[in-house]
Amino acid sequence: AADKAATEMARQGVALAAGDPDKRLEHLLRASDEMRATFLTMEARLVEWVGLFLPEVRFGKDRSSLPKLVGEADSLATLADKLSVSMPDNGPSKSEWKTLREWGESTATFRGKLDRLENAIRELSESHLPSLSIMLGPLLAARLCVEAHGRMRLARLPAGTVQVLGAEKAFFNHLKTGAAPPKHGHIFMHPWISRSPRWVRGKIARTIAAKASIAAKVDAFEGEPWSQSMVDEIDQKIESIK
């Protein structure tokens, strides 16, 4: 009887966890981080590999089209033509090209999986964290929620803590060595901070953290979700700081 009761309690616990948006966001976000790390490794390998045979290619920051181009090319000559570069004197063997092409296909497939995973995060975040999502974007909102271990815990954090969520290593280094304390954590990812002059980032981070803390409370206590006009007001305030 005790075993049966324990099994039933465990089953109910799993069922409750499956219905918990905080837990679901955590799994989605961790999976996304792991998948992105793998994708970036695969993409970097592909860029180096193609560059070995086609040294004239200059990818710059935009590499997004390369995996698909490689995967669809039936030969190195076809790829060189698509990239508008000349063919080298020494090219890969048929088996080597096949392997390179398959790597391109796999990288493109991985990119598609990552996009679908991030779309799932956006969808859940916009439902679970509507005000924070419209303010910071659903991916950053989800990251702050997961870092705080849940929507309610995020809502209860002071703005100063929200400001440095994700900068724990830098904060502990500050305590240990006396180095300068971090001015921001994950919220640095938002263009409001990352695209602002360095000397005003701390002030902007404090403003954003204060507003994000309020948005988190609205979401946690299921108040009226913020509108775009409210976000526009924040944007105007930040512009006045710069």
Q: What is each PLM-predicted segment?
A:
Residues V85-L139:
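Helix-hairpin-helix/helix-loop-helix acidic hairpins
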Residues V146-A220:
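Phosphate-backbone recognition surface of nucleic-acid-processing proteins
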Residues D74-P88:
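Long, charge-rich alpha-helical interaction segments
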Residues I204-K242:
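Acidic, carboxylate-rich catalytic segments that either coordinate divalent cations
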Residues D33, A37-L40, A44, G71-D74, ...:
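Generic structural signal for well-ordered, non-transmembrane alpha-helical segments
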Residues A1-K61, D74:
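Phosphate- and other anionic-substrate recognition elements at nucleic-acid/protein interfaces
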Residues R122, E126, P130-V162:
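Basic (Lys/Arg-enriched) interaction patch that binds polyanionic ligands
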Residues R24-E34, T38, P92-S95, T99-E102, ...:
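Non-transmembrane, amphipathic alpha-helical segments
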